[in-house]
């Protein structure tokens, strides 16, 4: 038995399908050029086996062309193409992310994956030893596919990301009313020792105070809680459109993030990191902190870390060995923190008759255990 691979040009990705077989050589002509083909006389795991197992395994690296997570939704041109291909086969797609192309080649050579995808300059290739699967892929592919997939992704990233009604950022400044939900902000902000107006500012950034808001990724309600996050928090998905339940869930999650960043002693700075993590994910923010620390910056100061959040969109940074969670669209996260802080500054002039709940000065923490400590 020997391992042989076929290369198929797709325009900006390298797709590789691998298996073990004995070969005979054949030249094939496809819309994207001449292909050197190898047809197996035996094949250890091919199209029929994949359809029987119900799973197509894709191995890739993190990156904007390959595969990344954005607000709970997985994107990347290669991933979306492979997802469509898996759908056409009637199977689910499982994605395995590795550090570099050498690891991908190793997994391919060992027959552990069905498709390997990684970016190559200016074109997409595919190599395969699974002849049936390769022919299925060739017959399924059409020249307009990449453009269609890229348009789909760009539409998701550029159109309004949250379907929502736009409400005023402040209902009645003179009357001390920011929103219809101020009573809930006041009640629950105390649990995380936040000024309630900061929670209101974050809510406006998330949903513009629309309790029926829903994002393209499926986040719901005032504070845009993902269904999976609701499960983690023990909140019924059916209650995510209920204002109080949604705010309560968000506060519980914020409390967990505060615990995650308890190594940041300054409360104001820690809150910046919590806000950034609520938007972009705590793992990515930790990656940016590690990059900042490596470059002799203060990893506990947001102004030092924010530039590295932006840099996680650049290959030389998201491929750095110190980075564990890969590519990130950091510009939105940096903007998210800035906008909330600016809106909160505007809200701080709001007076309310409920004077007991809105002090902007954090209360002194007691020594009891944080109710939102994560379990190991």
Task: Say what each PLM segment does.
Residues 85, 108-109, 202, 206, ...:
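Hydrophobic residues within well-ordered alpha-helices
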Residues 332-376:
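Low-complexity, Gly/Ser/Thr/Pro-rich intrinsically disordered linker/tail segments
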Residues 127-128, 132, 136, 269-346:
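Catalytic and substrate-binding regions of cell-wall glycan-acting enzymes that process beta-1,4-linked
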Residues 212-238, 246-256, 340:
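Substrate-binding/active-site groove segments that recognize
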Residues 26-120:
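Extracytoplasmic small-molecule ligand-binding "clamshell" domains
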């Amino acid at each position: 038995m020997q391992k042989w691979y076929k290369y198929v040009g797709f325009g900006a990705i390298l797709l590789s399908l691998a298996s073990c077989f004995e070969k005979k050589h054949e030249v094939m002509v496809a819309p994207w050029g001449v292909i050197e083909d190898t047809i197996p006389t035996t094949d250890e795991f091919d199209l029929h086996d994949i359809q029987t197992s119900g799973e197509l395994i894709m191995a890739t690296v993190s990156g904007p062309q390959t595969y990344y997570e954005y607000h709970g939704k997985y994107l990347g041109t290669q991933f979306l193409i492979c997802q469509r291909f898996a759908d056409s086969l009637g199977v689910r797609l499982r994605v395995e992310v590795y550090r570099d192309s050498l690891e991908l080649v190793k997994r391919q050579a060992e027959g552990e994956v069905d498709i390997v995808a990684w970016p190559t300059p200016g074109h997409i290739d595919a190599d395969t030893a699974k002849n049936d699967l390769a022919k299925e892929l060739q017959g399924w592919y059409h020249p307009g596919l990449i453009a269609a997939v890229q348009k789909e992704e760009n539409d998701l990233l550029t159109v309004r990301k949250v379907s929502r009604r736009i409400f005023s950022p402040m209902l009645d400044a003179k009357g001390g009313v920011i929103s219809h939900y101020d009573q809930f902000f006041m009640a629950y902000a105390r649990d995380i020792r936040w000024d309630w107006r900061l929670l209101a500012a974050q809510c406006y950034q998330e949903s513009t105070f629309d309790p029926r808001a829903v994002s393209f990724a499926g986040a719901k309600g005032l504070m845009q809680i993902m269904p999976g996050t609701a499960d983690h928090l023990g909140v019924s998905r059916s209650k995510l459109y209920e204002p109080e339940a949604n705010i309560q869930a968000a506060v519980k999650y914020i409390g967990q993030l505060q615990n995650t960043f308890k190594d940041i002693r300054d409360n104001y700075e820690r809150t910046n990191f919590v806000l950034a993590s609520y938007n972009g994910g705590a793992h990515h923010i930790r990656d940016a902190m590690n990059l900042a620390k490596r470059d002799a910056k203060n990893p506990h100061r947001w102004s030092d870390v924010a530039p590295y959040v932006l840099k996680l969109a650049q290959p030389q940074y998201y491929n750095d060995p110190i980075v564990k969670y890969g590519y990130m669209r950091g510009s939105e996260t940096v903007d998210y923190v800035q906008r909330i802080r600016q809106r909160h500054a505007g809200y701080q002039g709001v007076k309310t008759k409920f004077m007991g709940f809105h002090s902007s000065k954090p209360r002194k923490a007691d020594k009891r255990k944080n109710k939102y400590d994560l379990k190991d």
